[in-house]
From Swiss-Prot:
Keywords from the named record: DNA-binding, Sigma factor, Stress response, Transcription, Transcription regulation
Renumbered residue ranges of the record's region Sigma-70 factor domain-2: 3-95
Regulation: Extracytoplasmic function (ECF) sigma factors are held in an inactive form by a cognate anti-sigma factor (RsiW for this protein) until released by regulated membrane proteolysis (RIP). RIP occurs when an extracytoplasmic signal (envelope stress) triggers a concerted proteolytic cascade to transmit information and elicit cellular responses. The anti-sigma factor RsiW is a membrane protein, binding sigma-W in the cytoplasm.
Cystine pairs: none
Motif (Polymerase core binding): 47-50
Disruption phenotype: Alteration (reduction or loss for the most part) of expression of about 60 genes that are high-pH-inducible, including sigW and its anti-sigma factor rsiW.
Biological process (GO), any one: regulation of DNA-templated transcription
Protein name: ECF RNA polymerase sigma factor SigW
PROSITE patterns: SIGMA70_ECF
Location of region: Sigma-70 factor domain-4: 125-187
Protein source organism: Bacillus subtilis (strain 168)
């Protein structure tokens, strides 16, 4: 996969826009999910994901072909998302949509293996509550929690994306989990 991406990047650097469209197709869902998990708003996540791809395209010449493209792209998206979070009004959370439920019905959440509807509702409510609590974490903790537990990235990848040492990543994950644990004690 990484070899194909590098091939496409070389084509993009030579002016082939279709090659970049292939790259977007590969990463669009992952980048959107990252933005959505950090912002909790569908429209803002779409805007930031689109902006991340635009920035990647415009700055593709600065990309070091010897590095991992996904890490570079995640860093762009993460930085843009953090910038958006910083610019938001403090009362944003009061008006935010419930994360993870855009366009989904309760019926679509029920698993076909015989899970009771009540259990599915409780699970969805818990998931939504956890997502809301994650959105209330400070930016530096929210970012690492989302990258580690939602996007399932390694500590090294998170460090590269955020341009911080792995030790700092571990500390932020620990402190983020502790902050999340304190928020969830009320349940």
């Amino acid at each position: 996969m990484e070899m194909m991406i590098k091939k496409r990047i070389k084509q993009v650097k030579k002016g082939d826009q279709d090659a970049f469209a292939d790259i977007v197709d590969i990463y669009k869902d992952k980048i959107y999910q990252l933005c959505y998990r950090m912002l909790g708003n569908v429209h803002e996540a779409e805007d930031i994901a689109q902006e991340a791809f635009i920035r990647a395209y415009v700055n593709i010449d600065s990309f070091d072909i010897n590095r991992k493209f996904s890490t570079w792209l995640y860093r762009i998206a993460t930085n843009l998302t953090i910038d958006r979070i910083r610019k938001k009004k403090p009362d944003y959370y009061l008006d935010a949509e419930v994360a993870g439920t855009e366009g989904l019905t309760m019926y679509s959440q029920i698993v076909a293996d015989g899970v009771l509807p009540e259990d599915a509702v409780v699970s969805l409510e818990l998931s939504n509550t956890i997502q809301q609590k994650i959105l209330k974490l400070p930016d530096k903790y929210r970012t690492v929690i989302v990258l580690k537990y939602i996007d399932e990235l390694s500590l090294i990848e998170i460090g590269e994306i955020l341009n911080i040492p792995v030790g700092t990543v571990k500390t932020r994950i620990h402190r983020g989990r502790e902050a999340l644990r304190k928020q969830l004690r009320d349940l």
